[in-house]
Amino acid sequence: MNTMGLDLSLTSTGVSIGGSTHSIRVDTRGVERLKEIRDSIINTAVEHHIEVVAIEGYSYASRMSQSHSLGELGGVVRLALFEHSIPFVVIPPTSRAKFATGKGNAGKPEVMSSVSAKTGIIWSGGDGGDRCDAWVLEQMLLVKLGRSHYDWSKEQLDALNKVEWTGLPNV
C-alpha cells in the first residue's frame, strides 16, 4: 500500500512518500496559491498511486495571523483527496509530537532531533521541520498499517490512541 504524509503549510508543505521527503513551495498568493498546492499534492498522489494519506490536523492553540488561510488550505486538500477517492486520516499536532518524541508539547526542533537520533536522517534546510513532520505523520500511518520498519516506545505508540482511524483501508 502506497502512503503519504502531509504537513500542510502555505509557505512550505512537507510531503513524505515511502520515507522520501520534499516540500512544496509556491510564489503565488490567495486562491491561486491554494490551487497550486492542491494540484501539486493531487498530481503527486496520482503519480505515486497513493492509497492513503496522513494529514496533520489544525493547531487550535496557534495564534498565527494566517490560521484562516491555513484552514482554507486544509479544506481544499481534504476535498481534493475525497474527490479522488483517496482516504485520509487527520492526526492532531500533539499526537504527531508525542509519537516523535514521547511528549505531546514538543516543538519542531525537538521532533527533528528525536527523529534524527532514531533514524540517522538529518533534517536540514529551511523546510527540514516541515519534511520531518510529514515523515512522522507517514510513519504513524505505517505503524497503524503494520508496515513501519522502526521500533517505537510505548509512550510513542500511545500517541496513536488519540487519532481517529476509521475509514482507512485494512484498519
PLM region spans:
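Phosphate- and other anionic-substrate recognition elements at nucleic-acid/protein interfaces
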Residues: M1-V171
